[in-house]
C-alpha cells in the first residue's frame, strides 16, 4: 500500500506543538553531532523556539568562533556588501540577545536561588533596568485590563439602567390603563333591577 504524502503545516494544539518541537529538536541536534563525528565536520545549529528561547549547538569550539569563521569565508566577495552588512547586524543582534537571555537567567536564579553576589555591578544595574521594564509592562497590562473591566461594567450598568427604565415605562402604562378602566367603569350609569313592582338600583 502506497503511503500518502504528509502535508506539512503548523500544529495548532500548543501542547502537541511543544512536544513535537522537543522531539524534532533533539533529533536534529543528534544528526548534527553524528555528521560532525562521522565526517569530521564543524557543524553549528541555531534554533529559536516559538517562545523565543535559544537552543544552539557548535560541535567544535563555540558558536561565536564558528560564526566568525563563516563571516571570514563569505567576506571575500561571495556576498554583496549590503547582504554582508545585514548579516553582521543580525549576528550582532543574536549575540546581544544571547547576552540578555543569559543576564535574565542569572537574575532569575539570583532571585529564586541566591547567588546575586556572583554578578558584577554593571550586570546588577542591567538586571535592575530589565526588572523595572518588566514591572512597568506588567503594570501597564494590568491597568489596561482594569480599564477594560471598568468599561465592561459601565456598559453593563448602562444596559441594566435602560432595561429598568423600559420596565418602569411599561409599569406606568399599565397603571394608566388600569386607572382608565376604573374611570370608565365608574362613569357607566346604574341600571335598575325590578322584582315585581319594586325597583332596586345597583
Curated annotation (Swiss-Prot):
InterPro entries: MADS-box/MEF2_TF, MEF2-like_N, TF_Kbox, TF_MADSbox, TF_MADSbox_sf
Tissues/organs with expression: Expressed in seedling roots.
Pfam families: K-box, SRF-TF
A single cellular component GO annotation: nucleus
Domain of life: Eukaryota
Disulfide bonds: none
Domain MADS-box residue range list: 1-61
Keyword tags: DNA-binding, Nucleus, Transcription, Transcription regulation
Keyword Transcription regulation: yes
Endpoints of the signal sequence: none
K-box domain mapped to chain residues: 87-177
Entry's Gene Ontology molecular function annotations: DNA-binding transcription factor activity, RNA polymerase II-specific; protein dimerization activity; RNA polymerase II cis-regulatory region sequence-specific DNA binding
PROSITE patterns assigned to the protein according to its UniProt record, in alphabetical order: K_BOX, MADS_BOX_1, MADS_BOX_2
Chief location: nucleus
SMART domains tied to this protein: MADS
GO biological process: one example: root development
Subcellular location(s) of the protein: Nucleus
Job of this protein: Probable transcription factor.
Name the UniProt record assigns to this protein: MADS-box transcription factor 33
Lineage: Eukaryota, Viridiplantae, Streptophyta, Embryophyta, Tracheophyta
The encoding gene: MADS33
Amino acid at each position: 500500500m502506497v503511503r500518502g504524502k504528509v502535508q506539512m503545516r503548523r500544529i495548532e494544539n500548543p501542547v502537541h506543538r511543544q512536544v513535537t518541537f522537543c522531539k524534532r529538536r533533539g533529533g536534529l541536534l543528534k544528526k548534527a553531532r553524528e555528521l560532525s563525528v562521522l565526517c569530521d565536520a564543524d557543524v553549528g545549529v541555531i534554533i529559536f523556539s516559538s517562545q523565543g528561547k535559544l537552543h544552539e549547538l557548535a560541535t567544535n569550539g563555540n558558536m561565536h568562533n564558528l560564526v566568525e569563521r563563516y563571516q571570514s569565508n563569505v567576506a571575500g566577495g561571495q556576498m554583496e556588501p549590503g547582504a554582508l552588512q545585514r548579516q553582521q547586524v543580525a549576528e550582532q543582534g543574536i549575540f546581544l540577545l544571547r547576552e540578555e537571555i543569559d543576564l535574565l537567567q542569572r537574575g532569575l536564579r539570583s532571585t529564586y536561588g541566591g547567588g546575586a553576589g556572583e554578578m558584577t555591578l554593571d550586570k546588577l544595574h542591567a538586571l535592575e533596568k530589565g526588572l523595572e521594564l518588566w514591572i512597568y509592562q506588567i503594570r501597564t497590562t494590568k491597568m489596561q485590563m482594569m480599564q477594560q473591566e471598568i468599561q465592561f461594567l459601565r456598559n453593563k450598568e448602562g444596559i441594566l439602567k435602560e432595561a429598568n427604565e423600559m420596565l418602569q415605562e411599561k409599569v406606568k402604562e399599565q397603571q394608566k390603563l388600569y386607572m382608565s378602566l376604573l374611570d370608565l367603569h365608574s362613569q357607566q350609569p346604574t341600571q335598575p333591577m325590578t322584582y315585581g313592582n319594586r325597583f332596586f338600583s345597583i
